[in-house]
């Protein structure tokens, strides 16, 4: 029993179980989102913890860690990523395409049949990575779609992907986000 207690004491936020337990605390989840996005959130609803999505029988299914919606109907998917996986066949890192797939599947349940597309709520897919995928040293990498011919022109689809880098060395993050990393 002592080994089990020692093993449990050594778990960190990087552990799937601990991450879900911590993020299931409403106050902590709200605070993390507020600090990261520099917004005020009054309340959140947990839509599902570890939601499994399999859009078609032959499609690749996924399991989303934490999905919440705030009081303005903005939807957030929070993921802890401890491995910088590569496709064994192509040797390419999978994180960029994984974020794209997660964003698409997050949207899949947000519209009912015959609802107009403009009713899609804003969404954030947030990957908390214990590695610096881009090797640039940023604490935060935020992505939105931009026009290549006019980089000032952003596609207003309200879909944002954020990759947090716990190994970051520069950029503006709050002390609370930094302590969350530690």
Located regions from the model:
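Elongated, amphipathic alpha-helical interaction scaffolds
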Residues: 1-182
């Amino acid at each position: 029993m002592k080994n089990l207690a020692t093993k449990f004491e050594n778990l960190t936020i990087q552990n799937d179980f601990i991450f879900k337990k911590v993020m299931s605390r409403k106050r902590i989840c709200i605070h993390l989102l507020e600090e990261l996005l520099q917004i005020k959130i009054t309340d959140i609803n947990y839509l599902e913890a570890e939601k499994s999505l399999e859009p078609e029988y032959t499609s690749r299914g996924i399991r989303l860690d934490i999905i919440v919606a705030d009081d303005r109907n903005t939807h957030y998917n929070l993921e802890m990523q401890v491995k910088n996986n590569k496709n064994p066949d192509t040797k390419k890192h999978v994180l960029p395409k994984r974020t794209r797939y997660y964003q698409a599947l997050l949207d899949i349940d947000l519209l009912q049949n015959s609802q107009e597309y403009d009713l899609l709520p804003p969404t954030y897919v947030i990957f908390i990575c214990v590695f610096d995928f881009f090797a640039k040293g940023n604490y935060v990498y935020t992505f939105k779609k931009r026009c290549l011919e006019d980089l000032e022109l952003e596609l207003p689809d309200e879909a944002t992907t954020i990759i947090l880098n716990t190994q970051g060395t520069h950029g503006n993050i709050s002390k609370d986000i930094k302590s969350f990393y530690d």
